[in-house]
Amino acid sequence: MQFLPIKSYSNIVEGNALKLNWEEIVPKEKLSYIIGNPPFVGHSIQNEQQKKEIRSIYVDENGKEYNLAGKIDYVAGWYFKAASLISNTNIKVAFVSTNSICQGEQVVGVWQPLYKRFGVNIDFAYQTFKWGSEAKDKAAVHCVIVGFSTNHNNEKKQLFSSTDKLDLVDNINPYLLSGKTIFVESVKTPICPVSPMYFGSKPTDGGYFFLTPEEKQVIVRKEPQSEKYIRKVLGAQEYINNVERYCLWLVGITPSELKSSPMIYERVKKVREFRLASKAESTRKFADRPTEFKQNAQPNKPYLIVPRVSSENRRYVPIGYIDPEVIATDATQIIPNATLYEFGVITSNVHMAWMRTVAGRLKSDYRYSSTIVYNTFPWPKITEEQKEYISKTAQGILDARALESESSLADLYNDVIMPVELRKAHQANDIAVMKAYGMIKKVNGKDKLMSETETISKLFEMYEELTSKK
């Protein structure tokens, strides 16, 4: 665009773009393009004024607020106002935006109203890239560029990858992938008959339940009767990086036992004080039960643990079985009754492809959510023979990990140094799962596994079929 940067004939209007009437500034008949770089403010860090602005904009034809209006990034306001302005015109829009509007639950919150109410169509997109800045205190911001209009045509759409590769495709969906436009909506229970997934236990304790190895040793030395109430604990970081950490697990402790353990008593007292000082009424109420985690989801049998945040540099999110004596915090998701077959499927490249597509992100790291990733995942219809075989390949992954028991999962799943046996075990499991899904195609008369793009297309088809029946 030769008119950038603006040097002359500029008409700059100062004001809040989300409160101004854009047509009063420039009639849409005079517009060909709208381009911009709106403010990057995530939904969780918006101030009250910004939240109010977004909620007042994201409304339907009757002025009713859309369900997810309170859970979308600030930049979405520019998308909505632009879509409203360009409806039934040939005007084209392009914004630099936070990549989170094309990930996880925000895809539904941001894009579904734009498609259904205004009939937008993505013309081109630049997938996630890290924002470059020369500022000394620059923040790590991951962005996308999205160009859209309401002028539907048969022209190929331009899809740029983070490596500057350009693909000409028939359609770009709101996940910024080539393929049919699908909206994966969060649900509280799985859409297929599989074991449910829950948050791990939530302490809401101000940190007073938690102990370093050194703090544990001091308590055990001075108050040996307390040792039975100290458990190993795992959040995502402890699980992935093999960090030793402990917590007080005081289920069943009697008042006399507590009084005879001054060090534990003092921590319980501080938990109570912390909860009483909370602004949340539900937390203040739980001050009357200061020996307990606020939410206890701990299973009494071995369970699968899934870290809620995992590095984008790992091909597989490290998932594994944990002994019930080890406490899982709400920095993880857990599946209490998971079979080996279920472990095999969710640790496969098929599930990982789904996760990479529909999960939200923390910066560029994956945020695994039960409601948007696990519960929406389409499982295959398989035979008992296939299920048994996947169970064997899943066990093969656990066996390969056991050969490197001294290594952390962070090291085992570092793609550069991943042990050969573990890689082979995952590949065998991937093939077994893909065959169960029928993700095989003929190429020159030979069987070949589908690519990740083809895998996602098939999963979207399955998802649409499963959810259309409900």
Language model region names:
Residues 1, 20-25, 81-84, 131-135, ...:
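Generic recognition of flexible, low-complexity loop/linker segments
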Residues 1-8:
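Short mixed-charge
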Residues 2, 17-224, 241-245, 255-259, ...:
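Signature of N6-adenine DNA methyltransferases within the class I
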Residues 14:
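Conserved residues in the N-terminal Rossmann fold of short-chain dehydrogenase/reductase
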Residues 38, 42, 86, 90, ...:
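A generic secondary-structure signal for well-formed alpha-helical elements
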Residues 70, 159, 244-249, 278-289, ...:
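Short coil/turn segments at secondary-structure boundaries
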Residues 120, 263-271, 286-287, 376-470:
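Non-catalytic DNA-recognition/assembly elements of restriction-modification systems
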Residues 153, 164-389, 465-470:
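Polybasic, glycine- and aromatic-enriched phosphate-binding surface used to engage nucleic acids
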